[in-house]
A protein has these predicted regions:
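Extended hydrophobic leader/signal-anchor segments used for secretion and membrane insertion
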Residues: 1-173
Length: 173
C-alpha cells in the first residue's frame, strides 16, 4: 500500500482553516508545483520525507513552507525537479549561469539541475510540531545555515555521530 501525503494550502485569509487533501506520492509533488505556479503569492506547507536535510529537518516530523520564486540564490533551500518526476528539497550550493548545484544538509554528495528545474523556494520550516515557522529570512535560520554550511569538511563525522542507527557496539549503554 502506497503512503498518502497531506497537503495544506494556506490562503491569504489566515483566519480560515487550511484546505487539506490526500493524494498518492506520484500526484503529490506535481500538484504542489502546479499550485505554486498557479498562485504565486500563496504558500504550500509540505510535509518533509527523507533524511537529506538532517540534522535540523527530520523525516515525518517537520514541514516546509514553500512559495513560488522567480529568483534563487546560493544558500536558498529549494524544491527542485532533478529528473522528470524526481523532486528534492535541498540547499543551493552553487549557481554557474543556468547550472545549479544542490546538496542536502544531511548529504555528502551533490545533485545538479538547471535554473528552470527549480520549482519553489522554502521560506520557512515548521519544526518539532511547532505552529510558528522558523523563517529562512530570520536570524535563527541564517545563523544555522552559516554555521552548518561552513562545517562541510567535517560533516561526515558529525552526521555519523548524530545518526540514530549506529551499530550497537558503538552506542552508549
Amino acid at each position: 500500500m502506497r503512503q498518502k501525503e497531506n497537503i495544506s494550502k494556506n490562503t491569504a485569509d489566515h483566519h480560515s482553516e487550511p484546505k487539506r487533501m490526500q493524494m498518492s506520492n506520484e500526484e503529490f509533488l506535481p500538484f504542489v508545483v502546479e499550485q505554486l505556479q498557479s498562485h504565486p503569492h500563496k504558500t504550500v506547507t509540505l510535509p518533509l520525507r527523507g533524511r537529506s536535510m538532517r540534522p535540523f529537518l527530520e523525516d515525518n516530523r517537520d514541514k516546509a513552507l514553500l512559495q513560488y520564486s522567480a529568483q534563487y540564490h546560493v544558500g536558498d533551500v529549494v524544491l527542485a525537479e532533478i529528473a522528470p518526476g524526481h523532486f528534492v528539497l535541498h540547499r543551493v550550493i552553487a549557481i554557474n549561469a543556468d547550472k545549479v548545484t544542490l546538496r542536502g544538509d544531511g548529504n555528502l554528495g551533490i545533485e545538479q539541475c538547471r535554473m528552470t528545474d527549480l520549482r519553489a523556494l522554502a521560506i520557512g520550516f515548521f519544526r518539532k510540531g511547532r505552529t510558528k515557522a522558523d523563517m529562512t529570512s530570520g536570524p535563527k535560520w541564517k545563523i544555522y545555515s552559516a554555521v552548518w554550511t561552513r562545517l562541510f569538511p567535517v560533516r561526515r563525522y558529525l552526521l555519523f555521530a548524530l545518526h540514530p542507527h549506529l551499530p550497537s557496539c558503538l552506542k552508549r549503554k
